[in-house]
């Protein structure tokens, strides 16, 4: 007896998987690959991940490239979805290079921050800081790029 799940059920299951697993599942079949590569899926996966657990946004303060070391100003902004409107706390992470990786490209205006989870695995989320006014968030595991600020995914959050 051959049992097949409807595609919308498969999509719903895939949405709940971590990025690292999705990358592997792109090889299962062409239907899964096209689903995972679709912009609609990428948007839903990101929103679903943020609804399941309180999302963290990485904030990197301005720094001088020569002093790019333990003294870099790095903080996480954690949202608490159990309160309405969202509350948040800011936690400074002094010298915790194992939670993030900052690289300076050949261009002095481009800085890259790679975010790692508590298991020291890359989350796939990368922040490119081109200038003060232009930032791009990308998740290369899902080929996701977004020039909007993270607040686009948090309608209740107002930036000052």
From Swiss-Prot:
Pfam families from the UniProt entry: F-box (PF00646)
Superkingdom of origin organism: Eukaryota
F-box domain ranges (all copies): 1-44
SMART domains found in the cross-reference section: FBOX
Protein name per the record: F-box protein At1g15015
Source organism (scientific name): Arabidopsis thaliana (Mouse-ear cress)
